[in-house]
Amino acid sequence: MEHTYQYAWIIPFLPLPVPMLIGVGLLLVPRATKNLRRMWAFPSVLLLSIVMIFSADLSIQQLNGSSIYQYVWSWTINNDFSLEFGYLIDPLTSIMSILITTVGIMVLVYSDNYMSHDQGYLRFFAYMSFSNTSMLGLVTSSNLIQIYIFWELVGMCSYLLIGFWFTRPIAANACQKAFVTNRVGDFGLLLGILGLYWITGSFEFRDLFEIFNNLIYNNRVNSLFVTLCASLLFVGAVAKSAQFPLHIWLPDAMEGPTPISALIHAATMVAAGIFLVARLFPLFTVIPYIMNLISLIGIITVLLGATLALAQKDIKRSLAYSTMSQLGYTMLALGMGSYRAALFHLITHAYSKALLFLGSGSIIHSMETVVGYSPEKSQNMALMGGLTKYAPITKTAFLLGTLSLCGIPPLACFWSKDEILNDSWLYSPIFAIIACSTAGLTAFYMFRMYLLTFEGHLNVHFQNYSGKKNSSFYSISIWGKKETKTINIRKYFCLSTLSTMNDNEKDSYFLKKGYPIHGNVRSMARPLITISHFGNKETFPYPHESDNTMLLPLLVLVLFTLFVGFIGIPFDQEGMDLDILSKWLAPSINLLHPNLSNSVDWYEFITNAIFSVSIAYFGIFIASLLYRPVYSSFQNLELINFFVKMGPNRILWDQLLNIIYNWSYNRGYIDFFYAKTFIRGIRGLAELTHFFDRRVIDGITNGVGVTSFFVGEGIKYVGGGRISSYLFLYLSYVLIFLLISYFLFLNL
């Protein structure tokens, strides 16, 4: 077994030859490299598959042996400072390695077809392989210095991937926003690492945890300083995992290609922050204030992400806010001390979210043939609908991912989310109420996405020619570059109400407003969504199912979504041990909680599951009631009429919905607040500094120079241009200076 561990250092470096060879090929033989560009997908998938097999072997050994292996090389040692580099193989490393490689392989296979017509195909695979290298290096790091190095590389890769279509201003701004926001977290992480080294004198995890715990136990360190250092470390995780208040970069990160979104949101960047907290969990557990802070940030992010996803019309942004909320559940579990539940939800969410993102990519890919290569149109759920007829396989995969995220058994996320909800009741009833309510919101907005996308009719074919309004959209060519084309829009698309409201009244996208059955039934024939005429003349009339190379990863991820949850079934009765995850995590769990038991009996599990599933079904029911296609809603006429005839209460209800809609659609006004305070303040400070530098600093320097120039000119004219005159003036000034110095010396 140890023989296998000795070669684990190669794990991060196996995918590295791909970006290196692509770079060398583009420098030396660019034409041949570009002509044979499709072949680079094979080595990318092959090398990552080797890493996956290696990681699986290590995981099997972890299950059988329950051991932790660490190997280090001394780089520089003296009496005052030592730095060692190495790798650490423990359950957390093996779990993350399998997660990164399996999702990464699916994304690479999917991307071969998705990016086949893009001019940046080679650049895309180089970035993706280097991103996998960076993340694998991060999870195998044995000390904080290595963590920070690979942490920065992961951030750099995310910057490159988000801004992949850098010719589009909105994509360039998005990658800059992600980079700057993560700079805040990275600066906090660096300060926290330096603070911990100042306290313990070590960067190695084992030594650091042991020394730190002894110092805390013996009360030999300032508690305020320790809390500050731990908080700074947590700031890095907050930024990387898009937790409140550093979450603002996440929805803008959707400007990259969809496979990148799947990788970032499932296995790489956002998982890095969760991994950091899990890796430093023995340190955080001895500081109660930090654990409370982690759980507080987690529960705020859970609720905020869910509310912001309610009214999004971009399918990828909706999934982005869903990621934010679900990672909030994971962070909440870590803050509550539920180490196993947190990692369990990280695993189940990663596969479900990868399935949803790749499914959304298949949807976008099919919609591009109808509306053109513009994200504003191909990702807009208002233009979708009825895709079940055109993409049945994608629909089935997306539905399973949706139900999993909603928490419907026996799909993956049900098991992990149910465990977190149960633990939250033991930790704080207030947190539990928020977490359970958000579970219902999750089911609501996820099923809303599904209904708007797949049910009903293809809404892009409903065109409304009333009104005149022009708008300019950035259109994406098949090469990923911006086309400066102005598209005339007769009327900007929106969800129209089904009531007898005047045309001047504000339509709400958040809800299909009431059915005027008691008035004019014929108004039910009006389309649910009014669509503008985008001017796309030469496009296919209908979407189509994706190719097999894009559907294969979806089917594999469907299998993961169906069965990966069974590794964490918390049953251990009558000798039947089904909890593989606890056995896998045994070394870490025993280190943190020696006497912890995760098993529950059937009665307790069923009682808790009925409650959580009921909440999920209630959210699905509300979404079905509000967003189900018009023609299938006639059976609910009596219920709808009840809401329509509410009278004055209906006005209050509409006002409440508009408030919720405005909050959600405007991102909770958080971006607006940051723009008005931090961004404007920093720009004002920069302008003030620029003014001070130009007018004051440069003014003093230039003033001295100008004064010297005029003094010199004056002396030149006094001397008359003769050397004897200059010499006489020089000696005169020297004599005057000596006399002044002499009299001053006498006075002293």
From Swiss-Prot:
Membrane spanning residue stretches: 9-29, 40-60, 89-109, 121-140, 147-167, 185-205, 224-244, 258-278, 280-300, 327-347, 354-374, 396-416, 425-445, 551-571, 605-625, 726-746
Keyword Cytoplasm belongs to the record: no
GO-annotated molecular function: NADH dehydrogenase (ubiquinone) activity; quinone binding
Entry EC no(s): 7.1.1.-
Alphabetic keyword roster: Chloroplast, Membrane, NAD, NADP, Plastid, Plastoquinone, Quinone, Thylakoid, Translocase, Transmembrane, Transmembrane helix, Transport
Cell compartment(s), UniProt: Plastid, Chloroplast thylakoid membrane
Class of enzymatic activity (EC top level): translocase
Primary residence: plastid
Pfam families xref list: Proton_antipo_C, Proton_antipo_M, Proton_antipo_N
Membrane topology: Multi-pass membrane protein
NCBIfam families listed in its UniProt record: NDH_I_L (TIGR01974), PRK06590.1 (NF005141)
Described purpose of this protein according to its UniProt entry: NDH shuttles electrons from NAD(P)H:plastoquinone, via FMN and iron-sulfur (Fe-S) centers, to quinones in the photosynthetic chain and possibly in a chloroplast respiratory chain. The immediate electron acceptor for the enzyme in this species is believed to be plastoquinone. Couples the redox reaction to proton translocation, and thus conserves the redox energy in a proton gradient.
Assembly behavior: NDH is composed of at least 16 different subunits, 5 of which are encoded in the nucleus.
Protein name: NAD(P)H-quinone oxidoreductase subunit 5, chloroplastic
Species name: Platanus occidentalis (Sycamore)
Gene this chain is encoded by: ndhF
